[in-house]
Amino acid sequence: MDKPILKCVIVDDSTLQRLSIVKLIENHPSLDLVAEYNNAIEAKLGLANNEIDLVFLDIEMPILSGFDLLDDLSHKPQIIFVTGKTKYAFKAFDYDAVDYLRKPISKERFLNA
């Protein structure tokens, strides 16, 4: 039986990190990248207008953090946090995170998420 394809988005203020995640998603047959957002405000609008299954979410972003974004969403998709810091790991799992990936993300670690 085929795995369902998950519609996903990336929310990260770093262009380089978004490109890195895009390449990983493009090589994963179960993921369909719907959109990329460089800040949480744009993501909030996009997520309100689209049915998304999975979000690759940075935590530290200008104006609105990844946690703030989740607090503002009425429908919460599955979340994989993507950050360079470990200090948010416990809080991330308070949001029922699927996983917590540290930047830079290796292909092996991404596939295990």
Each predicted region: which residue ranges?
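Non-catalytic signal-transmission and effector/linker regions of two-component phosphorelay proteins
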Residues: M1-K7
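Hydrophobic/aromatic residues located in beta-strands of well-ordered beta-sheets
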Residues: C8, L33-V34, I79
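Conserved Asp/Asn-Gly motif in the active-site loop of CheY-like receiver
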Residues: V34-A43
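CheY-like receiver
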Residues: K44-L47, D53-A113
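Conserved sequence signature across two-component system core domains
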Residues: V11-D12, Y37, V55, V82
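Two-component/phosphorelay signaling modules centered on CheY-like receiver
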Residues: S14-A35, D72
